[in-house]
Amino acid sequence: MPTTRFLTNREIYEFAVLKLVPSVRQRLWIATADIKDMYVEKPGLTKQMVPFLQILAERLKQGVAIRLIHAKEPGPAFRQDFDRFPGLWSGIERVLCPRVHFKCIIVDGKRAYFGSANLTGAGMGAKNENRRNFENGILTDDPALVEPLAEQFDSVWRGAWCGKCGRREYCTDCPLS
């Protein structure tokens, strides 16, 4: 029986970032409007904080296919962290689409988080409780929710909207170009 859970604030970090993302086996799809250099707890004996990009780089080494859609160029701190993990350059598939405002994490096409939180420390609840945003979202394995979410992600990925998009001059990654 499918399970669906409503998450707020710190729960997004605990369930979507610390549990859902590490459970990926084959493919990880992430969509966000904003992306920053988020630091997360690395699973293990010590509570070491590492860049979320390190977690993604480790998943790539394990053979996970990762796709990222984001709406704007990340800032210098993110790019600096990105450069620390050379496997990300060739391993992560990325599309910049300035019209993307939906936020989701889809794991193996079977489980997903979707909601208001951008892929930032404040958005995903990774920051101190007095510094994080007020966010909410849904964590689910219900195919009735995961499948249309994956279709929305894939339609943007494929460029299904690019032909009629009025913002192509701002889009550096249009698949139709």
Please identify what each model-predicted range represents.
Residues 103-106, 136-138:
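Short beta-strand scaffold segments in enzyme catalytic cores
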Residues 95-99, 131:
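Short solvent-exposed loop/turn micro-motifs enriched in small/polar/acidic residues
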Residues 79-91, 167-176:
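Short, electropositive alpha-helical surface patch
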Residues 3-4, 91-93:
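Short, conserved active-site loop motifs that form the nucleotide-linked donor/cofactor pocket
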Residues 9-10, 46-49, 94:
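A conditional alpha-helix N-cap/helix-loop micro-motif detector
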Residues 70-75, 99-100, 143-144:
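Short beta-alpha junction loops
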